[in-house]
Amino acid sequence: MTQANNTVYTDLSVDELVKEALQRGEGVLADTGALVVETGHRTGRSPADRFIVEEPSTQDAIAWGPINRKFPADKFDALWDRVEAFNNAQDHFVSYVHVGAAAEHYLPVKMTTQTAWQNLFGRCLFINPEQFNPAGRDQWQVLNVANFECVPERDGTNSDGCVIINFAAKKVLIAGMRYAGEMKKAMFSVQNFLLPAADVLPMHCAANIGEEGDVTLFFGLSGTGKTTLSADESRYLIGDDEHGWGEGVVFNMEGGCYAKCIDLSEKNEPVIWKAIKHGAVLENVVLDGNKHADYADVSLTQNSRAAYPLEHVAKRAEANLGGEPNAVIFLTCDLTGVLPPVSILNNEQAAYHFLSGYTALVGSTEMGSGGGIKSTFSTCFGAPFFPRPAGEYAELLIKRINAFGSKVYLVNTGWTGGGYGVGKRFSIPTTRGVIAAIQSGALVGTETEHLDIINLDVPKAVPGVETELLNPRNTWADKAAYDEAAKGLAKLFTENFKKFEVSDAIKAAGPQL
């Protein structure tokens, strides 16, 4: 299709998109065949530039505030028209994709991008259906125009870039953003608003499935280990980041993975390593003179990324879905060295820690957070992506856990033997040992020890894991220092939890001073 002197490229193949990106100077090829691109001054998401249009059909259901910022409908319409006109005056790329692998819950999406590489990214991360929109549902539109510069005084934006979701119009506008993660997270936010109305819990988690059909969920913020731990050569990958949990099913919302690349190694992450080949996209990864990726080089960002389709993963779940989860794992990266490598949670503790979402920002995906590491609380282990009040998601989680009988665990992938700078981080093999024990069922009904201040129950033995690591107090040389650190962490938890209106039983399930 041609408009004026420009071409609209529709549903190009991976090979064609790579060719277009190279011809247009958008990136270069690594020695593996992956397309390598740079995203400019934004190398992570920009939460301050994300808005939701305020309109009658959804305004009373959204938890408005610093995360879900209001945007006027008339300003949105004007800006959409402006960006669309800018995009229509030049070559651009259109693909028709789905978000949501379950037949009952997919969204059909027309994805329009100014650049070939961002279209390739979308083809990696979204689902490329054999038949587009077989149920004939209303279509969503994503318009992603990287080189458009917003003018805040004219457009009502916060800066030269924006991500704006309009539920009534079924539109997502992304302007001035080269960091492609904005596109996937915008559609994640859309599903996170829509799915609870269908009694489906949307989740910021990874998922995999064992040979016997047992499913494990891995909740966690960026950098806590979702992608790494779910990419297990002994299990089938469902997905690494975005899922829905409904009656009888856990389904991936995506068709690909978006892995952090910092210090990536073939030894520790063989599944991810092998997936980075022709058709994959490397964002902000530095190449050496031989076009070989240097994953230790953080000169562009600590948030370097690899986007690849699930087809690049040898062991993957058929149809990107599985049954309900036997094990639900909350991954937390504890900077204080106070939390144990694994705790067994009851339902009230599960609700408490799901609402708290305690972890650390590690090589954060958000702009402005810098390279430093700091503790944070992110409700539902993904606060930036959940438009509804947090309690609605927590109620759905407990409903699903109760109905299926899932077991819930808190797994610390952070520090032990002291806090950050003193202790050491749990090794990936140690954490994999914990995960393997959980998945084998070895921790169900096992003998536990109660840790008073942090109010957690830890197993006395975990197959394949050193026993002295299980009670964190034992790993500290200075026991009094551990007790003080535990009290400090408990105070952080209780201060953060004051904002939640929940039952006394859930309040009592957290750390106690």
Curated annotation (Swiss-Prot):
Recite the UniProt keywords alphabetically: ATP-binding, Cytoplasm, Decarboxylase, Gluconeogenesis, Lyase, Manganese, Metal-binding, Nucleotide-binding
Summarize where substrate binds, as residue positions: 45, 179, 185, 305
Which purpose does this protein serve, as stated in its record? Involved in the gluconeogenesis. Catalyzes the conversion of oxaloacetate (OAA) to phosphoenolpyruvate (PEP) through direct phosphoryl transfer between the nucleoside triphosphate and OAA.
Query: What is known about its subunit structure?
Result: Monomer.
Q: What is this protein called?
A: Phosphoenolpyruvate carboxykinase (ATP)
Reaction equations catalysed: oxaloacetate + ATP = phosphoenolpyruvate + ADP + CO2
Question: What does the record note about the cofactor?
Answer: Binds 1 Mn(2+) ion per subunit.
Annotated SUPFAM superfamilies: PEP carboxykinase N-terminal domain (SSF68923), PEP carboxykinase-like (SSF53795)
Q: Which NCBIfam families did the record assign?
A: pckA, PRK09344.1-2, PRK09344.1-3, PRK09344.1-5
- Superkingdom is Bacteria
Query: What subcellular compartments does it reside in?
Result: Cytoplasm
> Which top EC class is named for this enzyme in its record?
lyase
Q: In which pathway does it act?
A: Carbohydrate biosynthesis; gluconeogenesis
Name any cofactors this protein relies on: Mn(2+)
Q: What is its EC number?
A: 4.1.1.49
Q: What is its main location?
A: cytoplasm
Which of this chain's residues are annotated to bind Mn(2+)? 185, 204, 241
Query: PANTHER family of this UniProt entry?
Result: PHOSPHOENOLPYRUVATE CARBOXYKINASE (ATP) (PTHR30031:SF0), PHOSPHOENOLPYRUVATE CARBOXYKINASE ATP (PTHR30031)
What the record says about family reads: Belongs to the phosphoenolpyruvate carboxykinase (ATP) family.
Which residues hold ATP? 185, 204, 220-228, 269, 305, 431
Q: Name one GO cellular component term.
A: cytosol
Give the range the annotation lists for the signal sequence: none
Q: Name one GO molecular function term.
A: ATP binding
Q: Which GO terms describe its biological process?
A: gluconeogenesis
